[in-house]
Amino acid sequence: MHLLPRETDKLILTTLGTLAQRRLARGLILNRAETIALISSQLQEFVRDGRHSVAELMDLGKKMLGRRHVRKGVPESIHTIQVEGTFPDGVFLVTVDDPISSDDGDLNNAFYGSFLPIPSADVFPAAPEPADTLLGALICRKETVKINASRRRFRLEVKNAGDRPVQVGSHYHFLETNPALIFDRLLSYGYHLDIPAGTAVRFEPGEKKTVTMVEFGGKKIFHGGSGLGNGSFDENLRETKVKEMVEKGGFGHKEQEKIEEGPVTEMNREVYASMFGPTTGDKIKLADMDLWIEVEKDYTVYGDECKFGGGKVIRDGGGQASGRHDHEVLDLVITNALIVDWTGIYKADIGVKNGIIVGIGKAGNPDMMDGVTDGMIVGSSTEVISGEKLITTAGALDVHVHYISPQLMTEALASGITTVIGGGTGPADGSNATTCTSSSFYMQNMIKATDTIPLNFGFTGKGSDSGTNAMRDIIEAGACGLKVHEDWGATPEVIDRALSMADEYDVQINLHSDTLNESGYVESTLAAIKGRTIHSYHTEGAGGGHAPDIIVVCEYENVLPSSTNPTRPYAVNTLDEHLDMLMICHGLDKSIPEDIAFADSRIRSETVAAEDVLQDTGAISMISSDCQAMGRIGEVVTRTWRTAAKMKQFRGPLEGDEPTRDNNRVKRYVAKYTINPAITHGMSHLIGQVAVGCLADLVFWTAESFGARPEMILKGGVIAWAAVGDANASIPTVQPVLGRPMWGSQPEAAALNSIVWVSQASLDKDLVKRFNIKKRAEAVKNCRSIGKKDMKWNDTMPKMTVDPETYDVRADGVLCDVPPADKLPLTRRYFVY
């Protein structure tokens, strides 16, 4: 066949488009991906027929599917579908705006060429939805936004005496505009148009307009333009140097006799949000969940927002400072970012330099903008990511990873994970069951194998040894922690020795305790821990641990508890899948009664239900995957938010929250896969939060897809993954738009933008030189001095009891129980399979 990449890419459209037709034919309404694929693949078939023009297909694309054929929120989330195909006269772009614009569409077009039966319209009842239930809905405060509020302004009369139109942007020094514009140039010295940042005023030939001018902010140092008023603003120059330059250059000038003060410009909140994103007091619905966030603070400056694009703000002499050296300015600015972090839910520009977040606040040009944060200058060396229609979170940490297959890492990155901690060597039986990279030989191989993967890695050695020699060896070989696992031995003696090594080397211990109760009950394990800090994996117990009451460790200050995601949240199918998962992962045999009893002892509806409650109250502090060993690496983020959504449904708003303001709950849950695992494993000084000094590992989401599929992942300040279209297309938004590895995922770049986390002892022994690795090696630290009190938004320590016969779980005497969910958000609406 000798197909080109662009042809094999489009086969994905055909595959999913055909699948969507089959689903529609049997009466299923389509989700967003299915809808786009069906319309796109049908357009390609019409292009192939060669009987339609580009213009005709732009119209035909609107006449396939109607609102009744797609899921709630799909019409509003698909603004444009674009394809490129080979017409009789070449390859051209077809753009279909608002493709779902009628109730009924025309299924004859949707099924054209498929030979599938066209379903009756009666199968798809139309049901209009209230606006506030739309995916990613935005509710703005009922007030206006005042721009440039505290500055002087006046009305200026302008005429275009030229024979061509002139368009002037918001932050262009008006004095410097086209010589064909006639107005009082001297009066305009030090002023720009009083219009929203990034907008413009157009003057047609011969047209007269009266516009409002507003004084520049900042230091009032001007650069660029035509050079009429360059330098520091000086009132004395208006009638001298500036006047001389205007006359010498032949710039249109007419003195304005009457000068009127202009009114403060006010913007409708909805209009403001459409341009710059939501601001203080505005509320956003997260995906299809009943979770709402409210913007707590906006650090940008109304009227001086950074905005990139043709004729917009970030241009020389405007929002981009002139004459700055590379070291003086940001490498990257993320403009108008809506940040969702444990520290708050707020709006700000984010500045990145050398892969590190160096500023969060207001970026721009301090020469002519107010409020620019120190160290956040935008210059000609600065790249821009427009964050105004996106939500920004810290990259997720998955700290329970079985390194079974390299393919796990692609799935992890695509889901928003930027750091993985765990152990293993591949699909060996030991690694299938436990997260241990057990020898120096394997440690070197695994660190080398992951040296060019764009994720931060940490490897845990085996801590199941009542002697200390092997543990010393593996820590000094690069282990960032130790794993104690019952499959290798989790006896009191083993736990005590492992914790002694952890204290000596300042690393963390991850514990999978003794389900069998072979050496003692949970009390014996707690006695062996002796009040020392430890990370308790899958604290509910289905993933392993003292049956039936390992969950009681949630009450202890020194125990840092986490969940693994197969039980997140408790749903009607949760228990039924667990037996087979458990048997395979831990090498059990269904023909052996004791193995069946062992497995059954770990699967309890009562403790799984209690886990929901304890996650919601902050008694369980973290969520991780246990990937390919009873968990799913690509669902750490998704299942965390499903849990949050379920618990709001069953328990209502948290204290301090409201029905349409869930900021406290959102901060609690985002902390579970960002800051808290970072603190637990001694990494929070560099990752786990959107904070100055941290690595720029950032994930960007649309509000309507929050928690399901990211738009872009930044790894150490470099784009490593993004949703991008056909590589042969004229623009990057042509279908199929797929999550794809970007430049930051290329091997040499990955080594530059990522970290390998190791022990300080291994660095002292010159691990980087011995292993010849390219990644930045960082030592974990402060793993031993932390406790439950340090878990952000997840530090509660209720008195726990578990009835050994009924398995009822009580926290501070209150029964922890919720029913299993039979329907959850972030499910079929978002995923094809």
UniProtKB/Swiss-Prot annotation:
The urease accessory proteins URE4, URE6 and URE7 are required for urease activity, URE7 supplying nickel for the functional urease. It catalyses: urea + 2 H2O + H(+) = hydrogencarbonate + 2 NH4(+). Its cofactor is Ni(2+). The keyword Translocase does not apply. This is Urease. The active site is at residue 586. Induction: Expression is increased when cells are grown on urea. Disulfide bonds: none annotated. Ni(2+) 2 binds at residues 483, 512, 538. One of its GO terms (biological process) is urea catabolic process. Ni(2+) 1 binds at residues 400, 402, 483, 626. In the C-terminal section; belongs to the metallo-dependent hydrolases superfamily. Urease alpha subunit family. It is an enzyme of class 3 (hydrolase). Residues 395-833 form the Urease domain. Carboxylation allows a single lysine to coordinate two nickel ions. The modification N6-carboxylysine is found at residue 483. GO terms for molecular function: nickel cation binding; urease activity. The keyword Metal-binding applies. Pathway: Nitrogen metabolism; urea degradation; CO(2) and NH(3) from urea (urease route): step 1/1. It comes from Cryptococcus neoformans var. grubii serotype A (strain H99 / ATCC 208821 / CBS 10515 / FGSC 9487).
